Amino acid sequence: MNNPQQPREYDAVLGGNSPSLEGAAVLGGIEGVKLRLQNPDSKVRIAALEQALNYGKQGLDLVIAGLKDESWAIQNAAYLILNSRTEPRIKQILQKPNHEGFKLQKIEVVTVNKFAEIIQRQQRVARYFIEDLGNGVKLEMAAIPGGTFMMGSPENEIGRHDKESPQHQVSVPSFFIGKYPVTQAQYQAITGTNPSYFKGSNRPVEKVSWKNAVTFCEKLSQKIGKSYRLPSEAEWEYACRARTTTPFHFGDTITTDLANYNGNYKETTEVGSFGVANNFGLYDMHGNVWEWCQDSWHSSYKGAPTDGSAWLDTEENTNLKLLRGGSWCYNPDYCRSAFRDPYNLDDLNFNIGFRVVCSGAAWT
């Protein structure tokens, strides 16, 4: 049995200047929770948020205050704690954008083993801002924190190609990218047209050339008043990997239960229909439709930029641009995080779409 006089993990101990715990008073209750919420260790603060629920409305208010914490980890923990509550007041708070203007959403992230069996499910929080395109059409943009990653594939990765070499370190500033590939409804709202072969307002737009995608970004920028563009190849892979190093953000392989590739579907599917995201809150990064990137085609990464910017100066073929992500009619190897392929900027196909990027303020 625990001795009630002994301090527990995360208890705040008040003992003046004495280095010994003997004779010190353990500050418990709601005041102890408040003190632990000032601790620089995020693990201590998260534990304090969980304990705060033991103290009624006053404790609940402390958790709500955690939504405005400077630390993303604390905001994340506070949101997940509150998301399980049923009070109308709490639900109303969670429906509103936070103090930074982001909409927080709970997402499910899964990991598979080499047999494509799900071995882990995690509840996480992603943050988005939402653009109103008119007539009820919205565009959700996910916040991607800046960071450094290894771009390309290691030599021992199954299914790799030489064009994914050499693997190299890239530092990417923070940015925003579409939660999903651009949908037909979104494309129609901005351009007034829908060229897609597989019709459906919530399916990804396809049969768009690189030039069509760039024109969409230009028109979107004019309408919204922010600068929208295609992702650089480095931004795309960084966003896809979402701090993973495996061939897919799910793990070593994928399954038709998690992605639309050359398997069961034989056409595009509605965006987000598999219900699982990567760690950054992005959907359909593997399969469904290929996605255009800004960059000109280079057959290897020799001389590639390392700052996350698009590689636009090329002497190989100025008409070739970059595709990423694979599609509904391609094998899994082509859907890997590192796979890259050239395509003529004027050509289009019923398996090629895109998603958009908006540069953002720095955070980590």
Positions of the model-derived regions?
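Short, compositionally biased
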Residues: 93-191, 215-218, 222, 242-244, ...
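Aromatic- and histidine-enriched alpha-helix N-cap/loop-to-helix transition segments
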Residues: 43, 73, 182, 207-211
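Structured beta->alpha junctions
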Residues: 41, 52-55, 67, 179, ...
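Functional-site microenvironments in short loops/helix caps that host divalent-cation chemistry
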Residues: 150, 154-155, 159, 196-341, ...
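Extended repeat-based scaffolds of very large eukaryotic assembly and lipid-transport proteins
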Residues: 1-101
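Short amphipathic alpha-helical segments
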Residues: 33, 168, 173-175, 201, ...
